[in-house]
Amino acid sequence: IIKLQKQDETAAIGLAEHYAQTISGALVRNEYHSAILHFYLRHLPKAHQRQALRFVKGWGMGNFRDEDWLRATKDDRRYPALVEKTLVALLSACEKHELRRLNERPPAILQKALDAYADNESLMRLWMKAKLAACKDNEALETLRCLIRKQQRFYLWKELADITPDEQLKLSALCKAILLQPKDEFLG
């Protein structure tokens, strides 16, 4: 799969899917197994994100190595750990009923990742959406407030306005979103 990706990416994706289907969650922890998941997540078309659910289920959520939890730094840039990428891809691919079910009984790996990568905005925003799907509005608000404290982004304030029941807070959050929004993106 690793060699084939340079010659024929589509064939390599198909072979990776066959590989995941064949091992079907069996315990396999090695660098090649992790490299296959990394390749699949990187090359999976956005239009086919739901396929990530099936692939990772076959790959095996219990197959992450200790190294897969570590972030990489290259050329003064930080890159997310494989676990982060995987969970973001999975949560992005989930539909509302799946997010609700996931929130009711979060797997241990998800809870560990939420604690380890609390600074990952994408992961935390997706987890907030899972809380909303499970009708845990107060928990979702608290998650969003934590994100806003760390990063003053206009879209976070907009999301706060969308989910808060307090009309005064809603108006304040919308005003803050407008103030923080880049001028070229403001459509008035």
PLM regions: where:
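Alpha-helical repeat scaffolds
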Residues: 7-23, 48-68, 100-114, 137-149, ...
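Amphipathic alpha-helical repeat scaffolds of TPR domains
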Residues: 1-4, 14-17, 21-97, 118-129, ...
